[in-house]
């Protein structure tokens, strides 16, 4: 078991519905610590860079529009096997297929507005964290 970090975004649907505290409670109840957190308005350039892996996908434009439609909360989470743990806590991308007790089952409205993003690997977590945080921003 390795102590590691992962990156999280509470998406505009979460901030719009004022459920960020409830989502954070689920994260912390799962044993993950929030060691970096900031509420920002993602720019178009930030969203396009962050989601560039999806650039050729048909939903890319809608995704960028959604992610820039309101404030988001970017986070650094830390804990034992944080990447896998947070992916488990988030639940399936489609909230209708997410397990009971997961963030997406409890809070997500649709596949497009599914409340949270989490890194899919430790390597990607490092890249994603570096896009929004410096080492000085993280209080471990």
UniProtKB/Swiss-Prot annotation:
UniProt-annotated binding residues for ATP: 11, 59, 87, 93, 104, 114
GO cellular component term of the entry, any: cytoplasm
Pfam families per record: NDK
Subcellular compartments: Cytoplasm
GO biological process, one term: CTP biosynthetic process
E.C. numbers: 2.7.4.6
Active site: 117
Assigned keywords, A-Z: ATP-binding, Cytoplasm, Kinase, Magnesium, Metal-binding, Nucleotide metabolism, Nucleotide-binding, Phosphoprotein, Transferase
Top-level taxon in the UniProt lineage: Bacteria
GO molecular function, one term: ATP binding
Signal peptide: none
InterPro entries linked: NDK-like_dom (IPR034907), NDK-like_dom_sf (IPR036850), Nucleoside_diP_kinase (IPR001564)
Alphabetical list of CDD domains matching this protein: NDPk_I (cd04413)
PROSITE patterns, sorted: NDPK_LIKE (PS51374)
Catalytic reaction list: a 2'-deoxyribonucleoside 5'-diphosphate + ATP = a 2'-deoxyribonucleoside 5'-triphosphate + ADP; a ribonucleoside 5'-diphosphate + ATP = a ribonucleoside 5'-triphosphate + ADP
Cofactor: Mg(2+)
Subunit structure comment from the entry: Homotetramer.
Annotated family: Belongs to the NDK family.
Purpose: Major role in the synthesis of nucleoside triphosphates other than ATP. The ATP gamma phosphate is transferred to the NDP beta phosphate via a ping-pong mechanism, using a phosphorylated active-site intermediate.
The name this protein goes by in its record: Nucleoside diphosphate kinase
The organism's taxonomic lineage, starting at the top: Bacteria, Pseudomonadati, Pseudomonadota, Alphaproteobacteria, Hyphomicrobiales
Gene: ndk
């Amino acid at each position: 078991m390795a102590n590691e970090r992962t990156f999280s975004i509470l998406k505009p649907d979460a901030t719009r519905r004022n459920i960020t505290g409830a989502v954070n409670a689920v994260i912390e109840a799962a044993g993950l610590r929030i060691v970096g957190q900031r509420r920002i308005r993602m720019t178009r350039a930030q969203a396009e860079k962050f989601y560039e892996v999806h650039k050729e996908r048909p939903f890319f434009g809608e995704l960028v529009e959604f992610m820039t439609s309101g404030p988001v909360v970017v986070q650094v989470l830390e804990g034992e096997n944080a990447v896998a743990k947070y992916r488990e806590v988030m639940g399936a991308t489609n909230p209708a297929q997410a397990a009971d007790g997961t963030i997406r089952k409890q809070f997500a409205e649709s596949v497009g507005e599914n409340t949270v993003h989490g890194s899919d690997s430790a390597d990607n977590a490092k890249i994603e964290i570096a896009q929004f945080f410096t080492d000085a921003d993280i209080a471990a």
